[in-house]
């Protein structure tokens, strides 16, 4: 059993636990991509989770309340050792300005069990949001989480949103099986 008290926290942006690969990222040169492309002339030393970006193109621009300038165009996929692409490329990339390639661990990792109870934050802020981490961050491919339970207690009318207790990013083939996570209260600050 783990008790997480978020009523008085020094740094709410940090994860409590991190599951990471011990493999170092690799450098790949990918000058361009086309939508639905299925192969690259690149041969990584092992299968990799890859994210490509074109910072000259913006997507998902929001207008009106909470407007923003959108996000850099990006796609992620699995690049196999033989250069085949697994996953769909959604956009055309006349140029790729950034490539992130993370080798995928071949041996599966299984995390079993655990009951976590979070006493929710009560952070006050008049404008905008500060998303809280205070979670388990998974950045390792071929990982399975089985039988984890997360409860939230002590929510009030004041507080900030969480980014998710199980936060999976920059990896592939992650399975969450027989897990239970309590939803958090919704707060309505705009701006």
Which residues are covered by each model-predicted region?
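Extracellular/periplasmic carbohydrate-active domains that bind, remodel
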Residues: 1-191
């Amino acid at each position: 059993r783990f008790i997480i008290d978020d009523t008085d926290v020094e740094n709410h942006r940090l994860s409590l636990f991190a599951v990471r690969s011990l493999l170092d990222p690799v450098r790949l040169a990918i000058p361009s991509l086309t939508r639905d492309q299925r192969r690259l002339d690149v041969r990584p030393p092992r299968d990799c989770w890859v994210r490509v970006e074109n910072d000259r193109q913006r997507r998902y621009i929001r207008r009106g309340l909470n407007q923003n300038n959108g996000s850099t165009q990006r796609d992620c996929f699995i690049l196999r050792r033989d250069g085949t692409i697994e996953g769909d490329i959604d956009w055309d990339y006349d140029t790729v300005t950034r490539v992130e390639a993370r080798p995928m661990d071949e041996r599966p990792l299984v995390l079993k069990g655990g009951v976590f109870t979070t006493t929710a934050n009560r952070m006050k802020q008049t404008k905008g949001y500060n998303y809280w981490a205070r979670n388990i961050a998974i950045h390792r491919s071929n990982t399975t989480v089985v039988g984890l339970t997360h409860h939230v207690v002590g929510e009030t009318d004041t507080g900030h949103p969480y980014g998710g207790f199980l936060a999976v990013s920059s990896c592939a083939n992650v399975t969450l099986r027989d897990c239970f996570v309590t939803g958090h209260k919704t707060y309505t600050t705009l701006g």
